[in-house]
């Protein structure tokens, strides 16, 4: 099952009664056997795939783990990017004292790799396509912050003036491609960017 997750919705339930509404529970209302394959941050909108049975879940999870999927995101970052394309390979780890924040850590961080491409300049920033090669928590958000261009509306990593420019995080999972777990055929999906 492919869904276009809205911003400000959990992928899976959290702790507490107020954190039970999520993509997984909503999909289960129509597809009771649905299983989460991957997640998007609460503030991120865009494409997710859920498996409908254990075999499909295993196969799709393996594709994500082995990096055989294709994912691209669109974002609006704060400030004008000078370069047209680039890569960020700074290693990331959880900032345990400030969870759920992540930080760059060259000693203990895990390998993280993001490619980016400027699409156009916009007022207060640049619109970019982001391609995560790895899938670390908050990877795109921290890598863009590392470049000095945090994502507009990011309540975790952007300065106050960049947060004030949008009521939501300007990050959207626009494209998702993977091999269908039954047919093996390549599937490619896109979701319109809502900002």
Roles of regions detected by a PLM:
Residues 17, 134-135:
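Short alpha-helix boundary/capping motifs
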Residues 1-113, 120-123, 170, 195:
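RNA pseudouridine synthases
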Residues 6-11, 110, 137-195:
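Pseudouridine synthases involved in rRNA/tRNA modification
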Residues 128-131:
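Short histidine-centered loop motifs in beta-beta connectors
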Residues 54, 133-134:
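Loop/turn elements at beta-strand to alpha-helix junctions within RNA-recognition modules
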């Amino acid at each position: 099952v492919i869904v276009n997750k809205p911003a400000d919705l959990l992928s899976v339930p959290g702790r507490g009664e107020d954190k039970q509404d999520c993509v997984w529970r909503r999909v289960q209302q129509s597809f009771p056997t649905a299983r989460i394959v991957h997640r998007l941050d609460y503030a991120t909108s865009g494409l997710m795939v859920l498996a409908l049975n254990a075999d499909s879940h295993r196969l799709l999870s393996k594709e994500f783990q082995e990096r055989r999927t294709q994912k691209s995101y669109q974002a609006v970052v704060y400030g004008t990017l000078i370069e047209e394309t680039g890569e960020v390979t700074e290693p990331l780890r959880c900032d345990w004292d400030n969870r759920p924040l992540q930080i760059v850590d060259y000693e203990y961080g895990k390998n993280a790799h993001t490619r980016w491409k400027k699409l156009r300049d916009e007022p207060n920033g640049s619109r970019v396509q982001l391609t995560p090669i790895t899938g670390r928590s908050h990877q795109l958000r921290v890598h863009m912050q590392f470049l000095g261009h945090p994502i507009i509306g990011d309540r975790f990593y952007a300065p106050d003036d960049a947060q004030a420019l949008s009521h939501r995080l300007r990050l959207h999972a626009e494209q998702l491609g993977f091999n269908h777990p039954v047919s093996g055929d390549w599937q490619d999906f896109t979701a319109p960017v809502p900002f």
